[in-house]
């Protein structure tokens, strides 16, 4: 265990397996995955959900506000205009935040499904692929009718086992079934119902499914018939028989001009009925007929037979037929590297070369092969040796066997030239490049490409083809470069984690048949996932059953599925039990401490960012604390970082494998490999991995365990109940004379088992009682196999273990990944799966090492699962994934056992564990070893063991009737034909690094900050931007001289690292709210709104790329603002009285951070930030007048001008100098300026400005304010506001006269001394400030300045803060705006750049400009706080002509769809 993995793991996996899996584990970026196909996603998912159920995963294609899908449609209730608007908003969001995660709902909630594409909207290649398959099946059907094959009459010598098998298989099929197979090509025709002469009973159901049930009197008769149709073509084993002469005819129903194609005699004697069907299935898809093989490019197919059904034999038989009867010359077989030798041995056994046969061999008994089998394995280490093998294969023909990794290296240019990057020492001498060698390498590359890809072989065969689960992985890309369309995928588990992996595999053998990933996700993935869980709605369940059947029927022509039911009739019984194990005290303490740390850090630490490593650490805990203790002692090795962070960030789970020649890098490598299929996992998406996270956070640390393991005693078996039960199972099995296998993902766990074995004695098997006791000794009494075991050593160990005469070796320790493929261990009949794998197929493949042809004894499987831990959750997800596979691939109806929340909430932590049981009920346990374990160790088992398959029982009562199947297909066709096409831009999986400064805090170190979060807090990846109503929030008075850090850090309950953040360059400000703030949730009835109560202290955190509100209980909300200002019902527009940062400009009301800055020839001083000392100083000068303006607002005349509801401010208001509502697209760090001065250091010269809303009045205003109030009451009444329908979102405090750019803007402009400049003339109706903050002066009152001539106060709506300069399209410097009598269609701004509060005095504004210089006489002069209108020519920014075209209008119709929105991210 010297090579600890960087994730804190152990030498845990097999480098051999990792080498061949390296490219497979290169999962593509979530974004690419979503585009190319996974979307949600779910993404997932799905993870999860699922990894599989990620489903994920998959919100990219769905609209979260839509209605639940119905049985006949997956459309939403959104109207077309609504969808167009959302599409437009999606584009804006995508441009603003291309990495934003698309999934908005909590991962455990059901997804809504977009409308399906119309059939005519499908890609042309998709329609062509489906049409080709339809024509192929029609041709085959026509051949069956024209050249019907006779029913084989099987002689008795060929029938002994078949007769026995079928006798136990149930009732015989009716005679009419024996005629021939019939494939239904079109179910949309209504003629079938008319031709039916049978009576149909229409049953009106009042149950939860309000649909029409048609009960056909013949349905019950055809139940068995339906069973036979499930797996595709050639699955009726009654027809899959030898003829009277013992021959096997391959080309059934062939035209008379074609010859009969028979299997070789030795193969015909060996194949089983289901294998005959598989060979015929391969022939129909790849050859079809001898004539068409010469003229067509052929088709691909998937042979999806379960493990142990002899797929290798079927392929070898088909290859022999292919070479004998067709012009095919080359076949490429790409297989897992550790099965290469097995494939070669199978070829030599079933089709021996001529030289291997005796001289007196009779061809009618054994027919030798006439083609060569070439192999590329680890013996060919140089390019020259590989090129020689390749050249021999191309010239001589035959079969070439190679591993996946070898194929990837030889076909991808990037990997060929450089290989996997390796760390090299700095050379002290210059590097010499051999140009001749470079030329040779390039020549090799061209030859490889020609042989393998262009044109490539005639047929490609991919064993364990479920590796093609990611269309963006390099191996998948390399395989898709092959030009041959005759592609075969062999897999026992076509659907492992999620439907998208299934789609990737189908898309390889039949490109474009299921459409794009988006089309497939919409039509099948999300409807099927929505109905998978026990809390799905009845409509979800029904739609899921319908769509599962439709998908199964679509693929049955080229996907042949045969399950373990075939094995059950040939093999002894198999019993698979799950034992839920309790944690010991030290394990529970460690696990509790670990989960507490996770909940405290949320997604900010390495655990939240890298769930793989969290799983690895947990695996150390529940397997045995000694493993964790060993890792803690070697923590320096654990920090070597064996997971590629960049790869992990892009893929979600992909783990890099160590280069060849290095020892396996521990448990992380192992688990990462085993979890590599979790690309779509909602588990991974839900915790929100930040790809820009600092590298240090991705290093596993064990400091949290140091205290608990200070006085830990190693070598105590009882510290792990799992280990106690394991040794009980081993010893009791040996006593019964049974050999046993032990599978674990962790190499360090296998090493620990070896340590405990060395201290114990081998039990006495039957018949050896008199012999002396012996210790367990490796390679004598037990074997071990992992990825580091050489291929030749593997074969020796396996053969020796399976030898019946070997009575000394009773135990075989295997790593799950290395030992689950290409290993036949029928010498054992008991298996212990020590830890649950992420991918259910790995554990299932481990089981199939013993339960396969050749097994003579009953098999017993024991799965040990740590209860009340993450492992139990992973096991639950295995059941869900397997259930989905049964439903889609096998067309079964497994029971729904878990809610989606149970399945997807992997990090759920149960604090209270039930008390140990005194005894367990063992009446239902028949197996003696397990029964004894329950009697001996009831305190170590949480509940009675149960059968694994009991959770996957097929509910035959839920099977679709023929009428329902017909309805399912019709509804699918109708959905394709009638729904409106809709495409939505892709959203990236993760946020950009806007919160990098926050998440860079190492949360798992005792030396750093450990925030306190709520116990029930769960990480949430993102929340969909929602519409929100502005909510009032006024800052409370902060004591004079309080600084940001002191104000924020004086409250110990906050426990917030202010200094840490400030050193990182993050602005932190503490604010006390004076009114309740509701954080809007999603637009659905099930979401509960969060609330920030009045009087609560919150922190406003503004980094370089984002602004956040942190509440006192630790929740963090990200603030976003997009869209146009909202139009109130009364036609007025509310705007906050602040402005965006000075560095941002406005393009016709649209925020554009990239717009060119206006030149400042006079070098005007610009504020660095909105909260700069200059602005704060200016604000303090008006503290006296604030109360005066506030008091005056309470007069009746003032209130009359405020017809709207009380002022409401965006709940995102948090950081000074920003605005929501003034600029339709505002940056992430822009918040309302109402909090401008709160918490800022003010110095000693000026009192702190107390800014309050009209609900909080000063009890006794100062005398200065009283006098100001008396003066203000002499002002004029407000002028009525003129309606203005078409306007420009002018972000300024000045009225915009009629604009000549639009002929509709013809309202005459009249300037009256008493009119309010903000609401006069043709000001846009949606830009009136009175409704957003009531009267803007209540926030930042304006007073006369001694330097500026005062004018009469106009009204209660007098000028407030200027939000930004006029749009640049309105600032044409060629117009002489300072001429007294020259009429302009619009006013020029006072400043050439946005100022914080333009009404306040500025040295730029000359106080002695005459009123005659105004654009309109008297336009600006009557208003207090404004200088006379006019602007120096030099201050006008250059006219930006290209922005004129971006003018947009707003209407009241958009008020509920095109509003300022806040994106709230709860952490």
Curated annotation (Swiss-Prot):
It catalyses: ATP + H2O = ADP + phosphate + H(+). Residues 728-896 form the Helicase C-terminal domain. It is found in: Nucleus. The modification Phosphothreonine is found at residue 1260. There is a cross-link at residues 115, 127, 272, 665, 682, 759, 901, 1014, 1018 (Glycyl lysine isopeptide (Lys-Gly) (interchain with G-Cter in SUMO2)). The modification Phosphoserine is found at residues 1169, 1172. CDD domains: DEXHc_ARIP4, SF2_C_SNF. GO terms for molecular function: ATP binding; ATP hydrolysis activity; ATP-dependent chromatin remodeler activity; DNA binding; helicase activity; transcription coregulator activity. Sumoylated. Residues 1136-1155 have a biased composition (Polar residues). Residues 1-150, 186-234, 649-673, 1120-1171, 1184-1221, 1247-1284, 1445-1467 are annotated as: Disordered. The keyword Ubl conjugation applies. GO terms for cellular component: nucleus. Pfam families: Helicase_C, SNF2-rel_dom. GO terms for biological process: chromatin organization. A motif (DEAH box) lies at residues 463-466. DNA helicase that modulates androgen receptor (AR)-dependent transactivation in a promoter-dependent manner. Not able to remodel mononucleosomes in vitro. Leu-Xaa-Xaa-Leu-Leu (LXXLL) motifs are known to be important for the association with nuclear receptors. Belongs to the SNF2/RAD54 helicase family. This is Helicase ARIP4. It comes from Homo sapiens (Human).
């Amino acid at each position: 265990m010297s090579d600890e993995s960087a994730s804190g793991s152990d030498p845990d996996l097999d480098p051999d397996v990792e080498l061949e899996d390296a490219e497979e584990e290169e999962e593509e970026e979530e974004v690419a995955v979503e585009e190319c196909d996974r979307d949600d996603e779910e993404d997932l998912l799905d993870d999860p959900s699922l990894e599989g159920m990620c489903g994920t995963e998959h919100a990219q294609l769905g609209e979260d506000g839509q209605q639940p899908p119905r049985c006949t449609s997956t459309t939403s209730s959104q109207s077309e205009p609504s969808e167009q608007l959302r599409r437009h908003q999606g584009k804006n969001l995508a441009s603003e935040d291309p990495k934003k995660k698309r999934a908005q709902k909590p991962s455990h909630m059901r997804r809504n499904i977009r409308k399906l594409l119309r059939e005519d909207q499908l890609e042309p290649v998709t329609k062509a692929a489906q049409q080709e398959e339809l024509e192929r099946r029609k041709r085959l059907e026509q051949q069956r009718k024209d050249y019907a094959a006779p029913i084989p009459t099987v002689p008795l010598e060929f029938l002994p086992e078949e007769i026995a098998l079928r006798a136990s298989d149930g009732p015989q099929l009716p005679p009419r079934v024996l005629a021939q197979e019939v494939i239904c090509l079109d179910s949309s025709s209504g003629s079938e119902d008319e031709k039916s002469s049978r009576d149909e009973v229409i049953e009106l159901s009042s149950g939860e499914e309000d649909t029409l049930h048609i009960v056909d009197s013949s349905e019950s008769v055809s139940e068995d018939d339906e069973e036979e149709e499930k797996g595709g073509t050639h699955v009726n084993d009654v027809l899959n028989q030898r003829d009277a002469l013992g021959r096997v005819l391959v080309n059934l129903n062939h035209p008379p001009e074609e010859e009969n194609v028979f299997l070789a005699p030795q193969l015909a004697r060996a194949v089983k009925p289901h294998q005959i069907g598989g060979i015929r299935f391969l022939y129909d898809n790849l050859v079809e007929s001898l004539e068409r093989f010469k003229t067509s490019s052929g088709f691909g197919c998937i042979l999806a037979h379960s493990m142990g059904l002899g797929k290798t034999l079927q392929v070898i038989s088909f290859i022999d037929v292919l070479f004998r009867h067709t012009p095919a010359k080359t076949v490429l077989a790409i297989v897992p590297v550790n099965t290469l030798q097995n494939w070669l041995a199978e070829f030599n056994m079933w089709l021996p070369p001529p030289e291997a046969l005796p001289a007196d061999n009779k061809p009618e008994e054994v027919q030798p092969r006439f083609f060569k089998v070439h192999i590329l394995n680890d013996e060919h280490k140089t390019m020259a040796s590989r090129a020689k093998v390749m050249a021999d294969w191309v010239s001589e023909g035959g079969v070439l066997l190679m591993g996946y990794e070898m194929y990837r290296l030889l076909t991808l240019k990037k990997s060929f030239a450089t290989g996997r990057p390796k760390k090299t020492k700095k050379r002290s001498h210059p590097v010499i490049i051999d140009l001749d060698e470079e030329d040779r390498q390039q020549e090799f590359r061209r030859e490889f490409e020609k042989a393998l890809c262009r044109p490539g072989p005639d047929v490609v065969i991919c064993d364990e083809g479920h590796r093609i689960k990611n269309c963006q992985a390099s191996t998948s890309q390399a395989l898709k470069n092959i030009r041959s369309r005759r592609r075969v995928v062999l897999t026992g588990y076509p659907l492992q984690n999620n439907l998208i992996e299934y789609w990737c595999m189908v898309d390889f053998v039949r490109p474009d048949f299921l459409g794009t990933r988006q089309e497939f996700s919409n039509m099948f993935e999300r409807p099927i996932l929505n109905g998978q869980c026990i809390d799905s709605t009845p409509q979800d369940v029904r739609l899921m059953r319908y769509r599962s059947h439709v998908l199964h029927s679509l693929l049955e022509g080229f996907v042949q599925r045969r399950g373990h039911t075939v094995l059950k009739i040939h093999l002894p019984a198999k019993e698979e039990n799950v034992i839920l194990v309790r944690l010991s005290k030290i394990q529970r303490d460690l696990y509790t401490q670990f989960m507490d740390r996770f909940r405290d850090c949320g997604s900010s630490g390495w655990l939240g960012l890298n769930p793989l490593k969290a799983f690895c650490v947990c695996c150390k805990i529940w397997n045995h604390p000694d493993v964790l203790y060993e890792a803690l002692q070697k923590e320096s090795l654990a920090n070597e970082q064996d997971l590629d962070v960049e790869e992990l960030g892009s893929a979600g789970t992909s783990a890099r494998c160590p280069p060849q020649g290095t020892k396996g890098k521990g448990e992380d490598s192992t688990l990462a490999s085993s979890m590599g299929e979790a690309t779509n996992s909602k588990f991974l998406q839900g915790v929100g991995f930040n790809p820009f996270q600092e590298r240090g956070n991705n290093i596993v640390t064990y400091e949290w365990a140091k205290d608990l393991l200070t006085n830990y005693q190693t070598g105590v078996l009882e510290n792990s109940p799992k280990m106690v039960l394991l040794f009980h199972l081993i010893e009791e099995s040996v006593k019964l004379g049974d050999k046993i296998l032990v599978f674990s993902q962790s190499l360090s766990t296998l090493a620990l088992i070896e340590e405990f074995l060395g201290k114990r004695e081998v039990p006495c098997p039957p018949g050896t009682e008199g012999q002396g006791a012996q210790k367990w000794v490796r390679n004598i009494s037990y074997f071990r196999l992992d990825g580091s075991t050489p291929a030749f050593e593997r074969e020796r160990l396996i053969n020796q273990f399976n030898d019946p005469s070997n009575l000394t070796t009773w135990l075989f320790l295997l790593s799950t990944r290395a030992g689950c493929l290409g290993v036949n261990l029928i010498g054992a009949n008991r298996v212990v799966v020590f830890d649950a794998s992420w991918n259910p197929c790995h554990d299932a493949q481990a089981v199939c090492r013993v339960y396969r042809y050749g097994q003579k004894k009953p098999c017993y499987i024991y799965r040990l699962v740590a209860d009340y831990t993450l492992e139990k959750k992973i096991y639950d997800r295995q059941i869900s994934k397997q259930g989905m596979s049964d439903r889609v691939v096998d067309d079964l109806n497994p029971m729904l056992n878990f809610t989606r929340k149970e399945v997807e909430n992997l990090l759920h932590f149960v604090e209270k564990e039930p008390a140990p049981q005194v005894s367990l009920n063992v009446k239902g346990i028949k197996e003696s070893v397990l029964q004894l374990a329950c009697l001996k160790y009831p305190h170590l088992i949480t509940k009675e063991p149960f059968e694994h398959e009991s959770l996957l029982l097929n509910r035959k009562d839920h099977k679709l009737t023929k009428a329902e199947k017909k309805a399912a297909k019709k509804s699918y066709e109708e959905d394709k034909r009638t729904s409106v096409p809709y495409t939505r831009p892709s959203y990236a999986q993760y946020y950009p690094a806007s919160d990098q400064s926050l998440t860079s805090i190492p949360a798992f170190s005792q030396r750093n900050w450990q925030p306190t979060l709520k116990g029930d807090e769960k990480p949430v990846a993102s929340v969909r931007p929602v519409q929100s109503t502005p909510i009032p929030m006024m800052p409370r008075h902060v004591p004079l001289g309080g600084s940001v850090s002191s104000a924020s850090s004086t409250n110990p309950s906050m426990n917030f690292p202010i200094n840490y953040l400030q050193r990182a360059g993050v602005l932190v400000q503490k604010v006390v709210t004076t009114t309740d703030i509701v954080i809007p949730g999603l637009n659905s009835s099930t979401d509960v709104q969060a609330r920030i109560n009045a009087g609560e202290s919150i922190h406003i955190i503004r980094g370089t790329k984002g602004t956040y509100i942190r509440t006192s209980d630790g929740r963090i909300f990200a603030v976003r603002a997009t869209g146009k200002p909202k139009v109130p019902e009364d036609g007025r527009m509310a705007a906050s009285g602040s402005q965006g940062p000075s560095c941002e400009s406005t393009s016709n009301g649209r925020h554009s951070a990239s717009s060119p800055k206006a030149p400042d020839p006079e070098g005007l001083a610009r504020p660095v930030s909105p909260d700069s000392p200059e602005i704060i100083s200016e604000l303090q000068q008006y503290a006296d007048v604030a109360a005066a303006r506030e008091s005056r607002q309470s007069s009746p005349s003032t209130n009359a001008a405020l017809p709207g509801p009380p002022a409401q401010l965006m709940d995102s208001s948090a950081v000074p100098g920003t605005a929501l509502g003034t600029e339709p697209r505002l940056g992430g760090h822009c918040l309302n300026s109402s909090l401008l001065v709160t918490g800022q250091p003010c110095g000693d010269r000026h009192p702190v400005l107390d800014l309050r809303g009209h609900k909080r009045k000063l009890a006794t205003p100062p005398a200065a304010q009283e006098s100001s109030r008396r003066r203000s009451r002499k002002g004029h009444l407000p002028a009525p506001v003129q309606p203005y329908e078409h306007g420009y979102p002018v972000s300024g405090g000045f009225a915009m006269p009629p604009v000549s750019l639009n002929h509709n803007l013809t309202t005459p402009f009249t300037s009256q001394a008493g009119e309010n400049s903000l609401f006069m003339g043709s000001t846009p109706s949606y830009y009136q400030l009175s409704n957003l903050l009531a009267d803007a002066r209540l926030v930042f009152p304006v007073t006369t300045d001694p330097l500026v001539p005062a004018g009469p106060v106009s009204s209660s709506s007098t000028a407030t803060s200027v939000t930004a300069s006029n749009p640049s399209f309105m600032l044409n410097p060629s117009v002489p705006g300072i001429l007294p009598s020259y009429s302009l269609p619009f006013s020029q701004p006072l400043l050439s750049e946005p100022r914080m509060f333009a009404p306040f005095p500025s040295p730029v504004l000359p106080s002695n400009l005459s009123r005659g210089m105004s654009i309109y006489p008297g336009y600006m002069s009557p208003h207090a706080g404004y200088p006379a209108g006019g602007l120096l020519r030099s201050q006008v920014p250059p006219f930006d002509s290209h922005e004129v075209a971006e003018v947009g209008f707003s209407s009241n119709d958009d008020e509920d769809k095109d509003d300022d929105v806040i994106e709230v991210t709860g952490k």
